[in-house]
Amino acid sequence: MLDEYTAAGGDAAHYRTSEAYLYDLTVFAMSGTKLPYLRDLTDLVAPGAHLLDYGCGIGSDGLRLIEAGYRVSFADFDNPSTRYLRWRLRERGLDAPVYDLDRERPPAGHDAVYAFDVIEHVPDAFGFLAELEACADLVCVNFLRETPDEAIALHRELPVRRLLAHAASRRLLRYRRYHGRSHLVLYRPGRGSLRSRAALAAGRLRS
């Protein structure tokens, strides 16, 4: 994948053209890394809710949630991964929207939007959160703290503490830390409670 990334000339072109990344996502989906995130999401959002998988890639999380009784829409840039997702939906006889973010933004009104292992790929983390907040009544997102041994520059270093403070300034429903460096938050957009901010100030939300 390193050769493909270098040849593409950077992040934007890489994610829109990479076929190797499709296989990387497939292996990652099989690892079970995101299962705790899905458990937290489904713990707070009941089956039947309309969810948005933002930065969906091959759509493995959304397909799991459809099987669990949720209505799921998908959003990402048009690329080999989303074309594979469309094929997976057809093979299952499922009719679910797949929004091309180069052409349109998903509508507001979803019950929840989630983005797992996505925000570290975008140039503007807070702008990305604003996009999520415009789509749904609840946001579920994780913030990765990078390790020194990242093989290639696929991930951007995130201001994790500031992102956690942003979530705490909203109506924070849940915070969890997984795998040592993945900070998961579930919150509702809008001005938050003093309790959420006090929890952060007291050190109960640590990065």
Regions found by a protein language model. Give the residues of each.
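Conserved N-terminal segment of class I S-adenosyl-L-methionine
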Residues: 1-108, 129, 151-207
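A conserved beta-strand element that flanks and buttresses the S-adenosyl-L-methionine
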Residues: 114
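Hydrophobic adenine-recognition pocket in adenosine-nucleotide-binding enzymes
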Residues: 118
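A short, conserved alpha-helix within the catalytic core of class I
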Residues: 122-135
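Conserved beta-strand signature within the Rossmann-like core of class I S-adenosyl-L-methionine
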Residues: 136-148
